[in-house]
């Protein structure tokens, strides 16, 4: 969370330093998701072959190192290659750390995965504050990223001894012998649920500010209010989700989350005013907060796939939602209008509600 937010917050500075226009920047930034997608299968294989502790240790060194490389980029080619490598190392870190999270959750014998993702959001918030401070003191991105590398290195050295030494299955469960197996319907359902939720997340990340600016039309200083509302409830929701799962069960929480997502989006579409739209975005943040962490948690319990491979499979399917959702919004907004686009995303959010009961059958 700290590494990614540090990069995202310094994009304007790097854009100005390399004299990039919006079109070129958009093309260059596409290298990041390409790198993430290309590493999905590799991440699952490496975690299953060498264990999440080793992969996480190496990835936790390479990920911030790739960030430093971005700060040192002096051309479009270097920045593009750097973003591709940044995406690969980010995904290695993501799959390995979530595999560790599944193992720790198994030892606790209760839901704690959402809280782990809440810490990611909290670290991202801290990264944004640090970046604001760095910009205020005119610290160049390269120096800023070197400081972040030092911080992450210190965290790794401090916490490595607390990592699980090996990835194990619960007593009585057989460990699949093959690393690559065909995903069963249970894993595909989890991927579909993650797809719907991440399509909503991607929409909020990329289009919430535009929606407020063009549809709600608040004072200029309040244009980012919807995005801030979404991020706040997303972080808070992750810290409360585990308690809800303990009380009501993961499937019921996922099912309710889809309803909350759709309600929030439709509220902002049907009543496009500052108060109602902000309330709607608050609901969307709370609804999306727990879905992906719970999908990862359930995928880690697969009886047919190794945890690392199951997580990589669900993450791959879900990430397509994050990648495809925002462009679809743009096409529909161009053909009709932005309110119709958000109404469609509300229906996509409901896929989590429709698919969740099927998990119980599987």
Segment roles from a protein language model:
Residues 83-119:
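Cytoplasmic helix-loop-helix junction between adjacent transmembrane helices
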Residues 19, 51, 72-77, 217, ...:
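Helix-breaking motifs and short loop linkers at transmembrane-helix boundaries and internal kinks
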Residues 38-77:
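Conserved MFS/SLC helix-loop-helix module at the cytosolic interface between two early adjacent transmembrane helices
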Residues 115-164:
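Helix-loop-helix hairpin linking two adjacent transmembrane segments in secondary transporters
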Residues 14-15, 46-47, 133-138, 212-213, ...:
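Interfacial helix-cap and linker-helix signal at transmembrane-aqueous boundaries
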Residues 54-68, 252-267:
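Structural signature of the two symmetry-related core transmembrane helices
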